[in-house]
Amino acid sequence: MTFGKAAFLSFSLFGASWAGPSRTLQARAVCTPKAGGSSSIDDVPAIVKSISACGDGGTIVFPEDSTYYLNSVLDLAGCSGCELQVEGLLKFASDTDYWNGRTAMINVKNIDGLTIRSLTGSGVIDGNGQNAYDRFAEDSSYDRPTPLYITGGGDIKVSNFRLKNAPNVFVSVKGGTTNAVFSDMRLDATSKSENLPKNTDGFDIGESTYVTISGTTVSNNDDCVAFKPGCNYLTVTDITCTGSHGLSVGSLGKSSDDIVQNVRVEGATMISSTKAAGIKTYPSGGDHGLSTVTNVTWKDITIQNCDYAIQIQSCYGEDEEYCETNPGDAVFSGIAFEGFSGTTSSKYDPVTGNLNCGEDGKCDVSVVDYSVKAPSGGAAENLTVTTYKNRCLCQARSV
């Protein structure tokens, strides 16, 4: 009897002390940085303090109708698995002396699980680039920063806010970044002076894998999306680009061997751009390297007043005399321009596209379902491109 009681008591104590897993999820920590309320007060330290408190899986909120003045680089170090909820205005200082030579305005380095978004769509990040446009017009050596500079890390989501007046490239992704998604963004650069907002690429996608851009509009004065060396598995869908240099590979091969591969663009509207889609590679010789472009497709592209619908430049950055001696050796494999329609500008009328493959390279390029018109003529035939020595082998003409 004594043994039985002891056993029962032991079991009862064990049962009383054991607790099952909790069904209650812990709430994310939420921080709202205190804004200084004046452009003379740098709000970056307050934001960094909030990241320190809430950056590990929490949320940092910039409320609607609030203004934060960022007079120095905002480094998001420590923001792991966290969210920046931008409903108000983040405005960078226009001090060109401070920004000269600095790479990033918002620095995202080796961060995993970062989300930057606006729930309301009212959020704005203002690069305040007018002074940079004016200074660069006077001094082309002026070294301008990029508002959102991402190197390394992964599982990054950026969505549903406006990024305006970047001094330089709007968004840069490189350094082995993987799984980055940009959606429902609005990027625009406008100068109030005669000095254009030069080099304001919308997105520069360099060394990275599995980057997606969708539902986005870009109005700028350079590439809408540039596929830079090391770009691999990039998808761009439902994008509208105005005033740009196109959805472009390159430039590649300036001083090293460069590769871009596995890119798909589908569903783009290109308005008043120098070209809608294209490739830019340096020729052979000198310090130039080998350019390799593999498995890149542009599909269902609508042209509105673009100078060229499609363009391949295999003698980029050098003059014709140089390229006669050093014809292009770029390797193009599995390149497809599919389903292009619309009307070009009158700049090259009746020519609507210019495809130039170098003699010493490979030119596996196809153009199908091409119905782009020049202002003076009808639709062009489908085209297939092969190599020819440093000449425009194949021009898409209205017929």
UniProtKB/Swiss-Prot annotation:
It is an enzyme of class 3 (hydrolase). The keyword Translocase does not apply. GO terms for biological process: cell wall organization; pectin catabolic process. PbH1 repeats lie at residues 177-207, 208-229, 231-251, 260-283, 293-314. Keywords: Carbohydrate metabolism, Cell wall biogenesis/degradation, Glycoprotein, Glycosidase, Hydrolase, Polysaccharide degradation, Repeat, Secreted, Signal. Its EC number is 3.2.1.-. PROSITE patterns: POLYGALACTURONASE. GO terms for cellular component: extracellular region. It is found in: Secreted. Residues 1-19 form the signal peptide. Its main location: secreted. Glycans are attached at residues 295, 382. GO terms for molecular function: polygalacturonase activity. This is Probable endo-xylogalacturonan hydrolase A. Pectinolytic enzyme involved in the degradation of xylogalacturonan (xga), a galacturonan backbone heavily substituted with xylose, and which is one important component of the hairy regions of pectin. Activity requires a galacturonic acid backbone substituted with xylose. The gene is xghA. It comes from the Eukaryota. Belongs to the glycosyl hydrolase 28 family. SUPFAM superfamilies: Pectin lyase-like. The active site is at 222 (proton donor), 245.
